[in-house]
């Protein structure tokens, strides 16, 4: 009986370890900070319609946009170029309700030109983002 309980607990722990495994190479490259763990099971795939709550800042902390201010998550189709590359890459790695902070290098954000007079040219950006659905 103890052997069955031990094996059951071991399998549960192994399952949890697999579900919460992160991509160390990606996390190092994009300086990912985990704020809240997600369910570890539900990941979006290319072509999925997703909803993300986010706050975007310049690296000096100046906020340029936030879905929280509008009380409405941002929706887009993952992996089809509707958002900056850093977003497609980051959101694809999030599980449901996971929240991270990620630093997006300018070449995977708004590039050499910046955007809308708010984001300067060659600006690396910081996003806190949470996958809602």
Regions found by a protein language model. Give the residues of each.
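Cross-family detector of peptidyl-prolyl cis-trans isomerase
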Residues: 2-133
């Amino acid at each position: 009986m103890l052997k069955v309980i031990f094996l059951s607990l071991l399998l549960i722990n192994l399952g949890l370890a697999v579900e919460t495994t992160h991509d160390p190479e990606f996390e190092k490259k994009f300086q990912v900070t985990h704020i809240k763990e997600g369910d570890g099971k539900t990941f979006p795939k290319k072509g999925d319609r997703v909803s993300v709550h986010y706050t975007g800042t310049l690296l000096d902390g100046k906020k340029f946009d936030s879905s929280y201010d509008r009380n409405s998550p941002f929706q887009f189709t993952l992996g089809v170029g509707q958002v900056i590359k850093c977003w497609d890459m980051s959101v694809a790695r999030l599980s449901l309700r996971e929240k991270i902070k990620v630093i997006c290098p300018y070449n995977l954000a708004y590039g050499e030109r910046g955007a809308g007079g708010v984001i300067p040219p060659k600006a690396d950006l910081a996003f806190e983002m949470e996958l809602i659905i």
